[in-house]
Amino acid sequence: MLWERRSRLHEHIAFHSRKEFTQHFIVGFAMLGAALALLVADARCQLPGKPPAKYEASWMSINRHPVPRWYEDAKFGIFIHWGLYSVPAWAPTLRGNKMEFDWSKLAADPGYWFRNNPYAEWYLNTMSIKDSPTWKHHVEKYGANFDYYDFVPIFNRESQKWRPEQWAELFKEVGAQYVVLVTKHHDGFTMWPSSVHNPHREPDRQGAQRDIVGDLTKAVRAQGLKMGLYYSGGLDWSFVGPPIQNFQDLFAHVPQSEEYAQYADAHVRELIGRYQPSVLWDDISYPKKGDLVHIFAEYYNGVPEGVINDRFQVEHSDFTTPEYTQYTKIVEKKWETCRGLGFSFAYNQDEGPEQVLSPAELVRLLVDIVSKNGNLLLNIGPKADGTIPDIQVERLRALGQWLRMNGEAIYGTRPWVRPQGKTQDGVDIRFTQKGDSVYAILMERPKAREITIESIWPEEGATAQMLGATGDLKWSRDGKNIKVTLPEQLPGDYAYVLKITPKAWQVVKE
């Protein structure tokens, strides 16, 4: 995956010059769903009022589509990057802050990203850049004459071992509410038996032998979860091949031919018609000549409870998609952070525990996102045979264990009047609300049993409880604050949830 954002003043990515595109793209990376995304969200918000009985092929009609409640309530989904790139399963590893990328550093040396891309799913591109770490790795391990698509028979053999029911059971166990599978990444390799012929690939190199999309869709829905599909509309290296070495190259590598537009349209229509996904997740934009206004109308008429992300870069989206970062305040338009457990989406065999989010970091990431009206789409990167690496399973289960105790403060909630606060001794807090209750989530273990939460005023007769513990807690007003006595033994780990009912609190500002 590679994130891209554009201005509404230009249709799709038809910028007036490469320089303009490059400047815009770097800014897009640096912001990555922050201020610029807020402007995009404002410009593309749903129109108020009742949705139409039938959507017409016009943006006016399509913009009447409301974000369905299931997506607002879900909070946590699983993203899956699995494909040819899962055979070599290699990329340079990053060091540093695991919580979010510092995208602004790209402006200093934009080519650095493409030479040292930590996303293993970009293997085909990075191995095509002579003298890059991935190029050297590929030559040393496979030889200079080993083509990327020589991985096809290996993947087809290994993927026969995959058991989709085991994945779906795990996703249900860890508390995910929806799943988004990559159906075609930038390498053009399809994960379903498409009837749409790729004119630039031999039939035995076009896609997986197994209907991976269909098999997982069936297994996920059997567990009561929603199923979504990712499709790379903006890049397909079977139409415009690698390497992409800088942002100017990226501009030139987005196919704009009538041939590709028809190919992408046919793919998306086939995915919708065959699998009826609950999430339609595009990447990098979409060909200018594509027929999206008709496709969106057809999709919503067939799947009224479906949602569409913002990366098609047209006049409509249901949610925005910051990548490896999140917003710093409550955002009215629904949003979804996507990221891997490590620095790569696809499996990177060189990533160790030092590159992977800890259970505490993972829990706090989810809590922070939910407090600001977001969802977390957390990626797993399976091996070629479909096994999920142990460390990824461990992290998912740690999050799932926390959610079993504290999910009441996550699922089905909405942001409170402010997303965060502190105790007087400096413990960070995130707030959510649901029904007649407010949840104050302590982001670390307090040092003392008695804590004071600043600028909160509960009504007389309110009750305070800690999720996972029994009984009501003793509380009192302390000026403009609330003082709470915590249980002697705090339940669980990582973050601790106070539930205040009723939620008739007043925020007192100096």
Describe the function of each predicted region.
Residues 46-510:
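Mature catalytic domains of secreted/periplasmic carbohydrate-active enzymes
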